[in-house]
Amino acid sequence: MKTGPALLAAIAAVILSFVTTTPAQRPQPEPANPGTFEAKVEYYLQQSGYEFHKVKANSWYLLLPGKEMSQIRIILGAGPSSIAMGAVVVPKSNLNITADSLQKLMKLSYDLNYVRICIDSDDDLIVMAQLKDQWLSAAEFKNTINIVAGAADRAYGIMRPYLTTP
């Protein structure tokens, strides 16, 4: 499934909002309108049992503990009928791509299902999954959150020896 520009822009806006504001500065977003895809996603977030935060319309994040990463920030961006879930594994400033690290990431990519490892337009190493509305159920939604978190944690473990410090 190819990511649309609007969905990528929504995810980028969510990431940027974390960098430029503190939680106290962020106004509370409006609740989703009943019957919308946004309301459906919020319902699935509530059913997941995870604490989540709405950044703006169609944009949320949640924090999960990891084994390799102390905390995994799962970022969610919804389009009209699909949702992307992702996590920044290593920001550009700490990313050191070598032939060896790339080979290890490609092998991990082969092992993973329903999630991809990629470098985004900001040159950060990320993992992400995308789901269309017709594939979504509360169970599939929560499962995808766990798959993304697990993939991010595994990718970070592989990249740890290759990290640079800013």
Write out the residue ranges for each language-model feature:
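Positively charged n-region of N-terminal signal peptides that target proteins for export
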Residues: M1-P5
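Short, internal acidic amphipathic alpha-helical interface segments
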Residues: A84-D124
